[in-house]
């Protein structure tokens, strides 16, 4: 039965629509149901918060409403050692909440600010104990004080500040030059002291042969080339010419014949020999023997 009753109900539009600069509120009337209906059928209030481009268009950040957890934003000056994790642990909030409130994309965006917004509970212990947390200044409560100096005083102050900056700059340059000169003098003195204590090394001996030419002069090289290229070949040709012209075609050879004639004989490779005829002489013994034989 309960399910059938819910199906028979028709959609009921909002009776009242309230518009605000940052949100829209829709008011619904109670239906003619039983007293035991759920809280969904009761009147409720819907608050839509701007997101994305609408938040940037509004220009002014509105703190959360009291019904959304009673959270307020307090401002804290950043120190050099602060980080998102440290702030979250110190004030009992989430890192995501701090990044969301301050529009951080990365954790490094924290170091670009001088102060950060911390979401804390309204009327909580943190608001009473932590004195470094300060409430945010609204644009209406901020007061700007502008002090205008006369033109002469302003010009004098500007020139005095510029002169002081220039003097400090030039003094720094002079100090750097003095330090460089002193360090150079110290290095020069230490080098001179080191070289004075070291013994002088003997000069290396010069080698007589230098390079591929063995240390000879250019005219010596020219003379050697002429001797090898011209004189030796000419001497070689002349020597073989003389040897070829000195040999005779035939050699004479002479032998002695016993009957007193002379004969010439040629033997290849030997000098010619001459043979002279010698008359035969018989001794007295041979004649005596011949006469005795005839008398007998």
Swiss-Prot record:
GO terms for cellular component: membrane. It is a single-pass membrane protein. It comes from Homo sapiens. Residues 239-296 are cytoplasmic. Residues 1-217 are extracellular. The keyword Ion transport does not apply. It is found in: Membrane. The chain crosses the membrane at residues 218-238. It comes from the Eukaryota. Residues 74-118 form the LysM domain. Keywords: Glycoprotein, Membrane, Transmembrane, Transmembrane helix. This is LysM and putative peptidoglycan-binding domain-containing protein 4. Residues 46-59 have a biased composition (Basic residues). Glycans are attached at residue 30. Coiled coil: none annotated. Residues 29-67 are annotated as: Disordered.
